[in-house]
């Protein structure tokens, strides 16, 4: 049936005309999209769940807030033994206190800065000693820790590029390498939280995009290498969930913008001007107030990647606008996506 469907001309496939508004500038474009059944909605309800978690050990990084915090509570409720890596555990962060308040033997917060090799290795030993049988290994690693920033290339310092990469990319690589021996013993799972911006670049987000593109490549290489060893590697590419992750408050955006402007070379300030700079910051504020506050699609995707007998290579929890934009930017010639999204 599938072969017959794919062999039919596009004019005979179920499709629909879409009026697509570019969220960067308000311009509308009408596209004829085929086929309707390939929308992200078809991947939001997952089947083929494996056996219950039954105490399998999972490490999640970045559990102080956002996706990691929600994942820790959700996976604990599913029966996993959850080790919640928290950057601010030693400082008594509110998120850490809430997780600790559950007072469960199956949910343990641990101090973990993914940029610090000593803390990562200490986490390995803490988890190894917390396993009933270390020789059977650890079932899952969810690389969720990450930071974000904004600013056009000429507005962004090299220090910012390095800082974002150290957490998002090298932190993921460092943590994965350290835990692979335990994961190999369990023939377990690695789930890397990337982003839709790991598949399609976006203006004013180059430091973040670079790191997420890097996670995509790292995950593909790792998946190829781990396949013969029985370890499955998946990537989750969330859409716009900024409103749900508390990455930016209006005050934080203004603080970043002030420092960015103050640190700009004089020639850049003169050539672009304050009006242009302020307009870009205003757009960023609008973007940060948008997006979904319901993270359940991300939580469900990670859960499926950890529990399904045959997890997907990639998961796309995002709304239709961003999913369609990603398909256009990754599957169509660049000239077409440029015509639609660059003006």
Curated annotation (Swiss-Prot):
GO MF entry, a single one: 3-hydroxybutyrate dehydrogenase activity
Keywords tagged on the record: Acetylation, Allosteric enzyme, Glycoprotein, Lipid metabolism, Membrane, Mitochondrion, Mitochondrion inner membrane, NAD, Oxidoreductase, Phosphoprotein, Transit peptide
Cited Pfam families: adh_short (PF00106)
One of the GO BP terms on file: lipid metabolic process
Protein origin, superkingdom: Eukaryota
Glycosylation sites recorded in the entry for this protein: 219
CDD domains: type2_17beta_HSD-like_SDR_c
N6-acetyllysine sites (modified residues): 73, 97, 103, 132, 177, 212, 258-259, 280
Sites bearing N6-succinyllysine, chain numbering: 103, 259
Name this polypeptide is given: D-beta-hydroxybutyrate dehydrogenase, mitochondrial
Lineage, highest ranks first: Eukaryota, Metazoa, Chordata, Craniata, Vertebrata
